[in-house]
Amino acid sequence: VTYKAGDTTIFIPGYEMSLAERASKKYQVLVPSLYNYALFPTLKKFFDPLRPDMTYENGSRDYFVHRLADTYLMLAEAQFKLGKQTESVAAINAVRVRAAAKGKEDAMKVTSVDMNLIMEERARELAGEQTRWMDLKRWNNLVERVKLYNTDAAVGVRDIHYVRPIPQKQVDLSENGGFPQNSGY
């Protein structure tokens, strides 16, 4: 099969289709039962409708540096740690109501907050935004959470993963070993 720019090559319907229905298409159909670590739908928030093809790197979407939802979640955590449950709940609900489907705002609200809810809310709201490792490191539960929620990585995760290796070139350029490699690397 020969494709040209603009042709559909992979279709991700978001629902199951029969094998016969998938086979009738001249492109790959990726249904939920086929999702794996290599094939899965991208996060919609990163979708760039103006990008003409996968080789075009200059997308039209801005990079997320910081979002208001992140600020509310930081506020919720700070208020929780200060024992201000009401204020923490209000900050979490500001994020949840904004993300709710129309007419479902009240169903999304929480009435109490604990640290586990804050950790999970940050994981959901900030998925794919490159903040998770820093959060887990800051909370000192990186190894615990990886073992609990990522069975593929659980085997190899260790305490050294709280830090990253420093590029060897940087270590080599430092005067008198003033920039040593992080322990374990």
Features from the language model and the residues they span:
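Flexible, polar/acidic helix-loop-strand segments at domain edges
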Residues: V1-R67
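Long, intrinsically disordered, low-complexity segments
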Residues: L34, P41, T55-V65, R96, ...
